[in-house]
Amino acid sequence: MDNKIVYVVSDSVGETADLVVRAAMGQFPFAPDIRRVPYVEDTGTLKEVISIAKSNQALICFTLVKPDMRQYLVTEAAKEGVEAYDIIGPLIDQIEEITGQVPRYEPGVVRRLDEEYFKKIEAIEFAVKYDDGRDARGILKADIVLIGVSRTSKTPLSQYLAHNKRLKVANVPLVPEVDPPEELYQVAKEKCFGLKITPDKLNHIRKERLKSLGLSDGATYANINRIQEEIDHFEEVISRINCQVIDVSNKAIEETANIIVNAVQNQKMF
């Protein structure tokens, strides 16, 4: 039984069938020769695979979601004396019977879910890498650029958009003593969102932040005059960029995120 040939047939990439076959074959002392046949869309290809499998005395394992394709392969393989094992079909049928729901019969669903997962991870890593203006190069690479003074929820909003919307977000803090990066004036204004907050609200947030750190709430960081200076600087920069401004004074992260996503969708940027 050394090098037993197994043809893995799929209407998508064939990763699911490949993994199952390797897991099963791992229980035996012989090494299988697994040959993947992906993206099968017609019975002609199935007929050809059956013929080759017969000549090689091979086994066929398949994941075909469409019932007519599954039935064709099983029937024709049996006629030729070729063993064909349906990996996913019986489970789909059983789930349909139990739930009463009709399957979509749509190939490649698992792969698309995997792709969405990796997009999410990529977006989260992007948000971490380009958080708080760490690297201005991220501004030109980002889907969204958040701009605001300290404590306007730039970081949690970046993470929320990355995790839930798979958007790559860079955020840029503004302070009067530091010139904004030039990239901020080069990126499309439609990608930029200024996060505005009232002085009183920001004063309260910063005082609470200082208390949580065991520091005096009388520090310059929470001084109302300093806060107003920062907000004035923010408005000057935003006026130059001419981007959309969102008042986050009394908004939850989810609310602000929805405003941004709706704006992006309306612009048909993605």
Curated annotation (Swiss-Prot):
Top EC group: transferase
Q: Kindly state which keywords UniProt assigns to this record, in alphabetical order.
A: Kinase, Nucleotide-binding, Serine/threonine-protein kinase, Transferase
Q: Indicate whether Kinase appears among the record's keywords.
A: yes
The UniProt entry's coiled-coil ranges are none
Q: What catalytic activity does the UniProt entry give for this protein?
A: N(tele)-phospho-L-histidyl/L-threonyl-[pyruvate, phosphate dikinase] + ADP = N(tele)-phospho-L-histidyl/O-phospho-L-threonyl-[pyruvate, phosphate dikinase] + AMP + H(+); N(tele)-phospho-L-histidyl/O-phospho-L-threonyl-[pyruvate, phosphate dikinase] + phosphate + H(+) = N(tele)-phospho-L-histidyl/L-threonyl-[pyruvate, phosphate dikinase] + diphosphate
* Its EC number(s): 2.7.11.32, 2.7.4.27
Kinase found in the keyword field: yes
Pfam families membership: Kinase-PPPase
Q: List S-S links within the chain.
A: none
Q: Which InterPro entries does this entry report, sorted A to Z?
A: Kinase-pyrophosphorylase, PPDK_reg
Kindly list the positions annotated as binding ADP: G148, V149, S150, R151, T152, S153, K154, T155
Entry GO MF terms? ADP binding; ATP binding; phosphotransferase activity, phosphate group as acceptor; protein serine/threonine kinase activity
Functionally, this protein is described as follows:
Bifunctional serine/threonine kinase and phosphorylase involved in the regulation of the pyruvate, phosphate dikinase (PPDK) by catalyzing its phosphorylation/dephosphorylation.
State the family named in the UniProt similarity comment for this chain. Belongs to the pyruvate, phosphate/water dikinase regulatory protein family. PDRP subfamily.
Q: What is this protein called?
A: Putative pyruvate, phosphate dikinase regulatory protein
Q: Which organism is it from?
A: Bacillus cereus (strain ATCC 14579 / DSM 31 / CCUG 7414 / JCM 2152 / NBRC 15305 / NCIMB 9373 / NCTC 2599 / NRRL B-3711)
